[in-house]
Amino acid sequence: MGKIMKLKPIREKDIYLQEAMNSTIKYCRIIRKPFKNKYKYFLQIIMEGSAPKKIKLGIGKCGLDEGTSTIAYYNDTKASFYVLCENIKKYEKEIKEYTIKYERQRRLNNPQNYDENGKIIKGSRFKNTKNTIKTLMKLKNAYRKKSKYIKQNNNYLVNRLLEQCDLIIKEPMNFKALAKRAKETKKSDKISTSTKKDESKKQVTKSTCSVATLYKKKKRFGSSINKRAPGYFNSRLESQIKRYGGDFIDIDIKNYKASQYNHITKEAKKPKLSERTKLIGKDIVQRDLYSAFLLYCYKDKSHINFDECEKLFKDFLNKQEQTIKEERMLYNYAIKEKEELDKAHKNFGLNDF
């Protein structure tokens, strides 16, 4: 006799599920997922047609600046800044703990499979004890929770964004390319320090000692993309806005240069990744929010509407201040700028104006 699977009755308040179950069942499939020390089985029902709509699409346009770990948007009513999967660290910590524990147990129970240097011998087979299998199941469960959290968080942000507008202006992002390591090996001009026994530090540059030659790191944004899945957010946003009857515009990055332009001087200057603020006239702006503002002031795919920028810039500054005061979820970008605003003003020499 096969396994009996029961379906829970539909709740009266769950309108979405009631509408979905009115459609014709196309086919079913059984899905297995790890939960703590065992697997659980779920029946997934695929219905005919499109899914019911949960939200109401907003009206108006929106400038969206996407990053590998954050998004910033600006529209008629609001300027906001969000971190993708802000609480991902607790899931990463759990995965790390179980990974280390599983590797230790496997090494302890299979010492013959490792050489003198601690490397695995090719062709060796591992025997897992009951405790090792339990640890492995907990590790799989941790990965499942992380995946579910990323998907749930990104879907929530997509829905909140669609409630604000029906036209999104953004930059096309190739997250697959950003995740790859750099191919070229480049030397760095940074100074390395060597510590002596008397704890006195001696500065050594690459010109004074060949041993102290420093090289730039080849890693880029792979770790951040793995943790926060900005590619999933982008693809989900594009598919959902089309399904709800809205649209999106991908600007020409080479000509538009939303992250580089200053609408007052009308000049483009490429900033460093560490520079999170920009000086526009006499005002300091958060770089990502300002990029979203320039995307909002859209003329065509290659040009910014500078006249619209001048008209709306004061309104942008007010919205930025309100965002920094009210939304304490701004990670360390805008909050840090707010706390150190007076210092930044002095550094930029604004007291001279």
Task: Describe every region a protein language model picked out.
Residues 39-353:
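Positively charged, helix-rich recognition surfaces that bind polyanionic ligands
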Residues 1-36, 222-223, 227:
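Acidic carboxylate diad motif detector
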